[in-house]
Curated annotation (Swiss-Prot):
Binds 1 zinc ion per subunit. Keywords: Aminoacyl-tRNA synthetase, ATP-binding, Cytoplasm, Ligase, Metal-binding, Nucleotide-binding, Protein biosynthesis, RNA-binding, tRNA-binding, Zinc. It comes from Burkholderia mallei (strain ATCC 23344). GO terms for cellular component: cytosol. Its EC number is 6.1.1.7. Zn(2+) binds at residues 564, 568, 665, 669. The gene is alaS. NCBIfam families: alaS (TIGR00344). Catalyzes the attachment of alanine to tRNA(Ala) in a two-step reaction: alanine is first activated by ATP to form Ala-AMP and then transferred to the acceptor end of tRNA(Ala). Also edits incorrectly charged Ser-tRNA(Ala) and Gly-tRNA(Ala) via its editing domain. This is Alanine--tRNA ligase. Belongs to the class-II aminoacyl-tRNA synthetase family. InterPro entries: aa-tRNA-synth_II/BPL/LPL, Ala-tRNA-lgiase_IIc, Ala-tRNA-ligase_IIc_anticod-bd, Ala-tRNA-synth_IIc_core, Ala-tRNA-synth_IIc_N, Ala-tRNA_ligase, Ala_tRNA_ligase_euk/bac, DHHA1_dom.
Amino acid sequence: MKAAEIREKFLKFFESKGHTIVRSSSLVPGNDPTLLFTNSGMVQFKDVFLGAETRPYSRATTAQRSVRAGGKHNDLENVGYTARHHTFFEMLGNFSFGDYFKRDAIHYAWELLTSVYKLPADKLWVTVYHDDDEAYDIWAKEVGVPAERIIRIGDNKGARYASDNFWQMGDTGPCGPCSEIFYDHGPDVWGGPPGSPEEDGDRYIEIWNLVFMQFNRDAQGNMTRLPKPCVDTGMGLERIAAVLQHVHSNYEIDLFQQLIKASARETGVADLANNSLKVIADHIRACSFLIVDGVIPGNEGRGYVLRRIVRRAIRHGYKLGRKAPFFHKLVADLVAEMGAAYPELKEAEPRVTDVLRQEEERFFETIEHGMSILEAALAELDAAGGKTLDGELAFKLHDTYGFPLDLTADVCRERGVTVDEPAFDDAMARQREQARAAGKFKATQGLEYTGAKTTFHGYEEIAFDDAKVVALYVEGASVGEVKAGESAVVVLDHTPFYAESGGQVGDQGVLANAATRFAVGDTLKVQADVIGHHGELEQGTLKVGDVVRAEIDAARRARTARNHSATHLMHKALRDVLGSHVQQKGSLVDADKTRFDFAHNAPLTDDEIRRVEAIVNEQVLANAPGIVRVMPYDDAVKGGAMALFGEKYGDEVRVLDLGFSRELCGGTHVHRTGDIGLFKIVAEGGVAAGIRRVEAITGDNAVRYVQALDARVNAAAAALKAQPSELLQRIGQVQDQVKSLEKELGALKSKLASSQGDELAQQAVEVGGVHVLAATLDGADAKTLRETVDKLKDKLKSAAIVLAAVDGGKVSLIAGVTADASKKVKAGELVNFVAQQVGGKGGGRSDMAQAGGTEPAKLPAALAGVKGWVEARL
């Protein structure tokens, strides 16, 4: 039975039992920003189990794509070397949300395994939690499993409820016993039943885990029964396929065999049992589906894990002798195997292939040099009998050649060598400390403040009349008063000033009363809810307890708000044009521009930029209102608001609906999209691997930019005596004319070279049967010099020639030697003899070489020495 049929039979079986087939959720969890990847079937139902979400069904079944390759759940090092470890796998599961419980879950599992999959009942063993008599009795008395094949597992991990057969979502919350089903491969395979000293053998393989959530655990560890217990089961598709296809390794099932054959095809390896082929076959699944779900190779978070997996696959191909990109070619084979079950994979095939190709090309640029350094170090270590690689070298490979530490460790592990990771960590820490020392820190760092939080009024007001000074700081120290001319940080009890946050710069403005004026140049957070006003006291004395009018620079705020709102619209437009993988990686919003960094693997084309601009400006013209709502975080995310991975959000969040965009944001924005006026992208480029940056302007800045661009177009048209609408056509005509003139000039230079060649031939001096010529050819370029040397070689038959030309203080040199003379006189050595005397160097073949120099005044003497130099070698 093939893997595709096993998957289909599982889903159809549970559908026949009243379950709703729910499509696999993304590998990037949408409801848990703390989880790196979806690693089990229950992740998408977590809020349902917690009671925070309801679904229109109480029974569900899924085939869930899962990844375990980072953080706590990390199988990467074992992948390819064991029978059952994978980075990517499919988890088949059935779930009950307060509907059926142990009895039905156990009977369903037994019926599927024995009646649908036709597994022999006497090959199946089960485990239960040691005091779960209910589950034990169902297995023994209702299903009929003999007592000798039902094993009670106790608290085998050192504490109450710490057991392989007791599942917990976390330290608190839903939990309960579980029952695992094992398949016995028979006495020919070493190993013992679960709970025995030989349980790690391969004879008894776990194929299904049935989790019974029946308790809630509080912070004190007390267990109370849930009013509506739930069921969460999981069976690895690859494991059950190995059992049903009568093989002992998951890599021998049909799905993997096709991918292993494809890997062998691309690497030129005949031995299909090679572990490196298993690594590559496994990794193409994880990499492809991660890219489908919007992950792009990068240097942090999920992107870094993806990059590690890609590079590990490439490194194993390199180990097999594949020294050129190959990995991306396996995407088509994966689509052939899994595209029917996952149409999103087939749809994304071109993008997945392109992302992997670019990542391969990038890594192959550095891998050869880095590998040669590592191989040399390992050879030296082996000769010395050492078993530990220097951590400083590992850091150099990481820092200079882009080798992740785990890649270096992987290569070392195969040689029985370990990496000195503490030394690596020390080197990394030193680099970070140097980076920190080179940076400039804001003055709010280190301010000791223990007062009340600041009340912010800046969403509604641009000024606050009765703001009280509650703290003052000069050079980081708390003071009671500030005098005119001093720079300080002022903390108020109420303020309309927005503090730098979320990429938006802080406000500028004035704090003043009848006797005092404090110019605010920047606004930063002292603490999460405490705002510091940075600036200089221009007149008077400012004391703690004084009351001032706090007024922001409203025009600057308005320009900043336009740019911030445009950023939201641009983010949505980029996702619409480029794909859902686009995610914000950083931003800077000020009064002049918006700078937006995002995940994407290729430069934006001119057409893509125009489309993004058009979409944003359509939203501007729609003049849609900006609607702000404060709501619980979970409600906001469920309502479609975009939350950024890695950002910390409180229980209550601010949601901004602006046109077609909905994001969590605490910044300041326009009241309507029409207030943006005009949106224009002015720059696009790369800032890191997999990260692009777009800069854009809005409002009057955009108008001035377009006007200046229009003026330049008009000026260019006037210079070419054309109308602006005819400019491109006129430029094309001028380019054609230039090409024609260049062709004529080249012909004239060749003609001139030919005539000069005849004259120069007469200047050649015969030395030992070889004609030696060293001369200057006025006005010649490099091409003319080469052509002249070739003609002189033909004319003189046996010759050693150096020709030079001077242009703008630079010397060009060409040397040519006929074949009969090149055994003793090398053109590369000859041209270097002259070049070194005129401040340059060069090289080439024995019959033709070129060089340059920067000291034309020394050229006559250098050429005069050629005859003697040649004579000495004949």
